[in-house]
Amino acid sequence: MSNSHLGTLCFIISLLGLANFSLSQTGLDDSTMQSLKSSLNLTSDVDWSNPNPCKWQSVQCDGSNRVTKIQLKQKGIRGTLPTNLQSLSELVILELFLNRISGPIPDLSGLSRLQTLNLHDNLFTSVPKNLFSGMSSLQEMYLENNPFDPWVIPDTVKEATSLQNLTLSNCSIIGKIPDFFGSQSLPSLTNLKLSQNGLEGELPMSFAGTSIQSLFLNGQKLNGSISVLGNMTSLVEVSLQGNQFSGPIPDLSGLVSLRVFNVRENQLTGVVPQSLVSLSSLTTVNLTNNYLQGPTPLFGKSVGVDIVNNMNSFCTNVAGEACDPRVDTLVSVAESFGYPVKLAESWKGNNPCVNWVGITCSGGNITVVNMRKQDLSGTISPSLAKLTSLETINLADNKLSGHIPDELTTLSKLRLLDVSNNDFYGIPPKFRDTVTLVTEGNANMGKNGPNKTSDAPGASPGSKPSGGSDGSETSKKSSNVKIIVPVVGGVVGALCLVGLGVCLYAKKRKRPARVQSPSSNMVIHPHHSGDNDDIKLTVAASSLNSGGGSDSYSHSGSAASDIHVVEAGNLVISIQVLRNVTNNFSEENILGRGGFGTVYKGELHDGTKIAVKRMESSVVSDKGLTEFKSEITVLTKMRHRHLVALLGYCLDGNERLLVYEYMPQGTLSQHLFHWKEEGRKPLDWTRRLAIALDVARGVEYLHTLAHQSFIHRDLKPSNILLGDDMRAKVSDFGLVRLAPDGKYSIETRVAGTFGYLAPEYAVTGRVTTKVDIFSLGVILMELITGRKALDETQPEDSVHLVTWFRRVAASKDENAFKNAIDPNISLDDDTVASIEKVWELAGHCCAREPYQRPDMAHIVNVLSSLTVQWKPTETDPDDVYGIDYDMPLPQVLKKWQAFEGLSQTADDSGSSSSAYGSKDNTQTSIPTRPSGFADSFTSVDGR
């Protein structure tokens, strides 16, 4: 045979082979599609008469005649689905919703290209156990409103790693919400709607740190705390109506995009946190039918509010009206017990002397608090000492723990304190001889502490109810850490081995949700997915916990490890990664120097900028290492929009490094004192006032709204950082000391900056929260005058700003007052009136005696009354309901109901840098600390 004939024969054989392959592929889908056609009772308006399924109505195929889309929606179709649908291996979209199809949903496992499965509003009776198996491309699944037999969400959901929207409302689901909805298993999940099922148990802590924007869990048997919501910073709408959730509403200040908050018909207790009330994004809130306490919250005019009178335990029905001081005190007492429902049910109204369980009064004064055998847990609140007429306190036969507060010894009329048969520990305080103290039945009384891992489930006694609570769960975690850490220290050798094992395991474990860096063994890890200015931190691939993370600490000394461990949800980053991003800590990258190290600018391979604070062996003494660990401990507990957030850290041999977000607008000091040199514009009064309020809110959280009281001790303009939006954030917590439980002062070495130091602190070294008030007063003076706290360029009698300010104020000379105002501030009548109020406030803050200074809450109230609050002016075009929330609430509800087909509330179908100050060495700061950070993630804000 000639070569030409042979070539022709080969060509013909190839064509026949290709034709046979094409026919076999088409035949595969054709058989399945014919089975589908036979199983369904198609209506007359559906034309599936053509022999080629690719030409059927609502069916699409690819270039190889493989079926990719079947979209038969709202056609009134009856029948069942065939069992061989899974052979449509190229299927991308299957939509059969709003029909009358019945029978079981067939096995669809292995459909690796399927992106959308929409079968809602049919008559399906069961779900295959391996429904999600092999569906690695699945992005959307809607099965709501089907009469399924009871079923449990299968573990195979974890295989749908691309899942974004999952709607399974009214689907007969039972059991608990699984943990795998966390960001590690389903990193792209943004909408989770599981309402009207039979779910029970608590919200999984794995929700923390997820990208979930819409969470609907209405009408079930769910219970426990909702504290995890405070760490779901991407939330836009959350609806938990009609469950059995209890405890307080957590701090929600980190949920900057939250629009809809519906917790109607639960058993929530405690004070509505100011962080919810002040959310500028909020449009709809529903709190009716709970046991919420304290004052009725006053939301902005743009917020649609559903708070039916007498359907909670508020002290009055008038929004914004303050409670009787006795009520505030007792609510604070209830907070330390974890806000038990039994107290919230009884403690209603604004007069605790009328039918409040356990409360007895005489002449309007509370004389007896009797909580015997009330099944209380938690601790004794020091706030009890505010009830100065108390004669009897009976807390016997409960499950209380902790110490007996020293403050109770100040009760001059107290005759009996009975804490028998609880779990108190420590040495009881010394009461007067006239007081009978009954402590029997407390096995650990007189000892350092109980042999337990938890102190109290309730909020710590040092916190106050006015700013809201983060719930009992968070306090329990905090307590656990205090006990666990010493244990970890005792077995450090074993933990080193475990840490090494974790590192090796982390290197082997694959994370399909991570995006591999092309340049190194790194991944891009989103720090705050709900933020407009996402900060991405490049770290080595690892097995990171979502949200809560591990609270224990271990460290591998291996230089080869890229990441050591996760502590309290923060990233432990290798020294090599930090060397790479800072150009090996080059001089060109230095942003500033401080007493304990140098701060470098770093840039990740994707362009993200960070600030790295490095303390080398030459400057890290034992004391410095203690400072470093203290700084980590404090920073990891700070969650507030106006406080710094720690991104990560590194411990490697003698290296100690902290990683902060980069703040493009630098420090307040730069804008206030060096704006000309840096080519900036001077701050106008409105901006200065907003910055002052931001700082006050951040420090207020430190003082009274955190689980324990913190004192900053070195407030100054170089420790106040500004973001691109010019919102302020307080930095430099290296000098913070944790105040003792229930107290607000400590005695320690003087650490701060001259000019900002309160006189009693500078002289005696005794520090209280009032030293921060003094420092803030100095900052207010600087904002008004544009002068530094200490200015050597001024005449000798005017070098010290506070002294000069007092002299001007005492003169009561109107011209002297106006001449003292920064000439760069444009003045009109309103501005002058505003400055006068801040001038007066600054003077009170810098009073010589600490007791004459206001607390930070008062400062916030004064400043907030002078600040124009932002109001929403545009409707989000991407609103999931397509509803204009600027319409009147009745119209919104009507449109919402029409969309949902429900008669109730909506358901669910269908700076220069962080961590650095001046480049100059600042000897007056003892020591200088970082001064730049960006927006914090999962805040625990009270304001």
Curated annotation (Swiss-Prot):
It is found in: Membrane. Residues 504-943 are cytoplasmic. Disruption phenotype: No visible phenotype. Tmk1 and tmk3 double mutants, tmk2 and tmk3 double mutants, tmk3 and tmk4 double mutants, tmk1, tmk2 and tmk3 triple mutants and tmk2, tmk3 and tmk4 triple mutants have no visible phenotypes. Tmk1, tmk3 and tmk4 triple mutants have a severe reduction in organ size, a substantial delay in growth and development, and a decrease in fertility. Tmk1, tmk2, tmk3 and tmk4 quadruple mutants are embryo lethal. It comes from the Eukaryota. It catalyses: L-seryl-[protein] + ATP = O-phospho-L-seryl-[protein] + ADP + H(+); L-threonyl-[protein] + ATP = O-phospho-L-threonyl-[protein] + ADP + H(+). PROSITE patterns: PROTEIN_KINASE_ATP, PROTEIN_KINASE_DOM, PROTEIN_KINASE_ST. Keywords: ATP-binding, Disulfide bond, Glycoprotein, Kinase, Leucine-rich repeat, Membrane, Nucleotide-binding, Receptor, Repeat, Serine/threonine-protein kinase, Signal, Transferase, Transmembrane, Transmembrane helix. Its EC number is 2.7.11.1. Its main location: membrane. The chain crosses the membrane at residues 483-503. Residues 441-476, 514-534, 904-943 are annotated as: Disordered. Residues 1-24 form the signal peptide. GO terms for biological process: pollen development. Glycans are attached at N41, N165, N170, N223, N231, N286, N365, N451. Expressed in roots, leaves, stems, siliques and flowers. Residues 454-467, 906-918 have a biased composition (Low complexity). The leucine-rich repeat (LRR) domain is disrupted by a non-LRR region, resulting in the formation of two LRR solenoid structures shaped like the Arabic number '7'. This is strikingly different from the horseshoe structures of the canonical LRR proteins. This is Receptor-like kinase TMK3. It comes from Arabidopsis thaliana. The gene is TMK3.
